[in-house]
Swiss-Prot record:
It comes from the Archaea. Its cofactor is Zn(2+). It is a multi-pass membrane protein. One of its GO terms (cellular component) is plasma membrane. Binds 1 zinc ion per subunit. It comes from Methanosarcina acetivorans (strain ATCC 35395 / DSM 2834 / JCM 12185 / C2A). Its EC number is 3.4.24.-. The chain crosses the membrane at residues 7-26, 30-49, 141-161, 180-200. Belongs to the peptidase M48B family. Keywords: Cell membrane, Hydrolase, Membrane, Metal-binding, Metalloprotease, Protease, Transmembrane, Transmembrane helix, Zinc. This is Protease HtpX homolog 1. Zn(2+) binds at residues 131, 135, 206.
Amino acid sequence: MKNMLRTTVLLASLTGLLVLIGDYFGGTGGMIIAFLFAVIMNFGSYWYSDKIVLKMYRAREVTPAESPNLHRIVDGLALKANIPKPKVYVVDSGMPNAFATGRNPQHAAVAVTTGILNLLSYEEIEGVLAHELAHVKNRDTLISAVAATFAGVITMLATWARWAAIFGGFGGRDDDNGGIIGFIVMAVLAPLAATLIQLAISRSREFAADEEGARISKKPWALADALEKLEYGNSHFQPSIRDVQAKETSAHMFIVNPLKGGTLQSLFRTHPVTDERVKRLRAMRF
């Protein structure tokens, strides 16, 4: 119920933001166009956000014949978690990570990268997937996917605003200088807004998924070992430009933050500190 409320707030916020932008740069006509665009975006975010995220990473669905061990793990964990088995996807990327998506447990998917499959042991992968199925069970996946779509739209608007500022705007308000200033302000603030949206998806849900995942697998130590390896692996991974652009809007979805953090990144951290997560997991007994 809480996640559905947050999703509704996000969708309403997206509508309000787009309408305000449309009104500022295009007056009444711009506001109407922005509202219609927002309605389409809201519909798409709810029904297709999971597909958008999977397509963003070029994830491919794998069959039991292609990945028997992966399906064996998901089969067992879904049974223990008492949820329908999600679809299983693999992302061809050296970045060691995993995420879950879907609007509800009946329409869910889990995705792992080839990097994580090459890095972790069978039991560690089991620990990671138990964490992801915990997100499915806790219904975190819809709001995460919607937030990723929302952040993507805002990032797109920021890019558009930068080009508009460079070329003098697109003929909105009568005050040309004011319009250009508006574009510049939007270009600067939009990426920050996208990050704040991801922060709104509470870090506490990662602790909750760690605990629930440990209960499902009965192997908290396996997830703890996996998190340590993933933290190290992601910090040494050199992503492509496309990877970076995708991760900026969906970093909150992954089991560990795929973005390399500086001081500012640490201030706007989308995940709890990995050391704290590991400490809590190692203290668990089932």
